[in-house]
UniProtKB/Swiss-Prot annotation:
Residues 4-186 are annotated as: Large ATPase domain (RuvB-L). Homohexamer. Forms an RuvA(8)-RuvB(12)-Holliday junction (HJ) complex. HJ DNA is sandwiched between 2 RuvA tetramers; dsDNA enters through RuvA and exits via RuvB. An RuvB hexamer assembles on each DNA strand where it exits the tetramer. Each RuvB hexamer is contacted by two RuvA subunits (via domain III) on 2 adjacent RuvB subunits; this complex drives branch migration. In the full resolvosome a probable DNA-RuvA(4)-RuvB(12)-RuvC(2) complex forms which resolves the HJ. The gene is ruvB. HAMAP family: DNA_HJ_migration_RuvB. This is Holliday junction branch migration complex subunit RuvB.
Length: 337
């Protein structure tokens, strides 16, 4: 699938081998969690209140586009609360017993973090309801007429769920989270701070303007910013003296085919296809997918969100429409309609 090869795809599995570096440069405390000020200020109060009452933090749901720091925030909460965190994901929990095993091994006030929580199976989700509300497990023993239900008490714990699709959560599950936080795309100055901090953690020689160049093209996403930084580092090591100046950063990013707006090949292909083949739209998703040879889910979940958020593309009841801003970006005159 083309999406898997995109350097700027925030959830690109090709770069899983670099997660060790990612963990090394992730912030560990709320004071270092830059760019989500409303989330940080609220979580500081919620965490301090829970500590004052010597209670577990209320269950927390974190949602937003890929790469904005949902897992990072979950680990920060665990560090701030001074508790252990167990991490899993929705697709991994196939049977009720999988979740029951995790829950029964939690210590008091521990955190259970479930990534992609919207992908939990209905059977597993049913187990969560009494666990979240009453700290109890309801388990069926036996089958048929001889079946009986037993209750197992659980230590007080905090469930943190992360998802890119909050709308896909069932209402009963969503309503059981006492705290809900949405992560937004980052501003350029916050991303510049993150890039510079990551460069310092990696002992890189980098000018502030070089960090700014990377931040401008990172699509408002820290994960992409850090990935681009590593590729710029490679370029600087080979093509210069390892020092990252604005000029080196610009040349490296141009080599990577990431333009000044953060668009890569697939972004440009989608926008140009709508402009050149469909006169700017409106055009349906099926036609767009056929025109660029990409899957519909990839277009909706990976390519389009940033283009829409930045005002280059619109989703309407009649289909996709390219905005005047996109025509201006490519230097193309909008056709008269």
């Amino acid at each position: 699938m083309i999406e898997a090869d995109r350097l700027i795809a925030a959830d690109n599995p090709v770069f899983r081998d670099e997660e060790v570096i990612d963990r090394a440069i992730r912030p560990k405390k709320l004071e270092d969690y830059r760019g989500q000020d409303h989330v940080r200020s609220q979580m500081e109060i919620f965490i301090k209140a829970a500590q004052m009452r010597q209670e577990p933090l209320d269950h927390l749901l974190i949602f937003g586009p890929p790469g904005l720091g949902k897992t990072t925030l979950a680990n920060i909460v665990a560090n701030e609360m001074g508790v252990s965190i167990r991490t899993t994901s929705g697709p991994v929990l196939e049977k009720a017993g999988d979740l029951a095993a995790l829950l029964t091994n939690l210590e008091e006030n521990d955190i259970l973090f479930i990534d992609e929580i919207h992908r939990l199976s209905p059977v597993v989700e049913e187990i969560l309801y009494p666990a979240m509300e009453d700290y109890q497990l309801d388990i069926m023993i036996g089958e048929g007429p001889a079946a009986r239900s037993i209750k197992i008490d659980l230590p007080p714990f905090t469930l943190i769920g992360a998802t890119t699709r909050a709308g896909s959560l069932t209402s009963p599950l969503r309503d059981r989270f006492g705290i809900v936080q949405r992560l937004e795309y980052y501003k350029v100055d916050d991303l510049q701070y993150i890039v510079q901090r990551s460069a310092d953690c990696l002992n890189l020689s980098m000018e502030s303007e070089g960090a700014l160049e990377v931040a401008r093209r990172a699509r408002g996403t820290p994960r992409i910013a850090n990935r681009l930084l590593r590729r710029v580092r490679d370029y600087a090591d080979v093509m210069s003296d390892s020092h990252i100046s604005p000029d080196i950063a610009d040349k490296a990013l141009n080599m990577l085919d990431v333009d000044v707006c953060g668009f890569d090949y697939m972004d440009r292909k989608l926008l140009l296809a709508i402009m050149e083949k469909f006169n700017g739209g409106p055009v349906g998703l099926d036609n767009v997918a056929a025109a660029i040879g990409e899957e519909k889910d990839t277009i909706e979940d990976v390519i389009e969100p940033y283009l829409i958020q930045q005002g280059y593309l619109q989703r309407t009841p009649r289909g996709r429409i390219v905005s005047d801003r996109a025509y201006l970006h490519f230097g193309i005159d909008r056709p008269d309609k």
